[in-house]
Amino acid sequence: MNKTYMANPQNVERKWYVVDAEGKTLGRLASKVAAILRGKHKPTFTPHVDCGDFVIIVNAEKIQVTGKKVTDKVYYRHSGYPGGQKATTFEQMIARRPERVLELAIKGMLPHNRLGRQMYRKLKVYAGPEHPHAAQKPEPLEV
């Protein structure tokens, strides 16, 4: 009888990838990056272990959306006080904090628990073309 392989958190080897978001569609890019953060692309994937890789996304300000989402997509947040709900459109969000758009899209595609929060920490998003992770020697990833 064969034994099913279970990844051990201490033995997981992590790689660094850099993804250029220029001209890419938001949801398509986010779903592929979320799969890499989870480790679904590895043959050693184990659901209860964080076995994903690190992902750096550059040029977040040049991400695209289809249809009328530029004006119609709304991001909500709440202060916790009565009447404290705030709404921001995609257009306003991309102007003020372009990296937040990608972060929210990818975070929504990860598990909503402790493991998902651990996976989310491996995501690094930058609005421009530069990133400070050259020492990790990230490989370019075409998505």
UniProtKB/Swiss-Prot annotation:
The entry's keywords: Ribonucleoprotein, Ribosomal protein
Molecular functions per Gene Ontology: mRNA binding; structural constituent of ribosome
Pfam families to which the protein is assigned, alphabetical: Ribosomal_L13
InterPro entries reported for this sequence: Ribosomal_uL13, Ribosomal_uL13_bac-type, Ribosomal_uL13_CS, Ribosomal_uL13_sf
GO BP of this protein: negative regulation of translation; translation
Gene3D superfamilies: Ribosomal protein L13
Self-association state and partner proteins as the record states: Part of the 50S ribosomal subunit.
HAMAP family linked: Ribosomal_uL13 (MF_01366)
Described purpose of this protein according to its UniProt entry: This protein is one of the early assembly proteins of the 50S ribosomal subunit, although it is not seen to bind rRNA by itself. It is important during the early stages of 50S assembly.
Family: Belongs to the universal ribosomal protein uL13 family.
Protein name from the UniProt record: Large ribosomal subunit protein uL13
